[in-house]
Design a protein with these regions (language model features):
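Active-site-proximal or metal-binding-adjacent scaffold patches in catalytic folds
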Residues: 8, 12-15
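Compact, glycine-rich, soluble single-domain proteins
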Residues: 15, 19-51
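C-terminal structural segments of small proteins and small subunits
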Residues: 47-85
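ATP/adenylate-binding site constellation spanning eukaryotic-like Ser/Thr protein kinases
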Residues: 10, 21, 76
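Conserved N-terminal beta-strand and adjoining loop/helix that marks the start
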Residues: 2-6
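Hydrophobic residues in beta-strands and at strand termini
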Residues: 7, 28, 71-73
Length: 85
């Protein structure tokens, strides 16, 4: 399943939930430098969907806050629940 996420770096409260436009919000404590925020976002999304970190891949948006991720085996109901937070 492809998921659009919006990464918010340097957040005091890291986590996954809520939405900004059509994108799932992923808050990370890491700065948006050297791919640190992206790596943290991939790990948080993997944990939120209960899949291994290695199975979540970045499709587009390596240098953007809005990213498209491929999350194989992601449950659409889980996505709806996370967007509603």
């Amino acid at each position: 399943m492809r998921i659009t996420v919006r990464v918010q770096p340097r957040s005091a409260h890291p986590g996954v939930g809520g939405h900004h436009d059509e994108a799932l919000v992923v808050r990370v404590s890491e700065p948006a430098a050297d791919g640190k925020a992206t790596a943290a976002a991939l790990a948080l999304v993997a944990a939120a969907f209960g899949v291994g970190r290695g199975s979540v891949t970045l499709v587009a948006g390596a240098r953007s806050r809005v990213k498209i991720l491929d999350v194989p085996g992601a449950d659409p109901a889980t996505l709806e629940r996370l967007l509603a937070l």
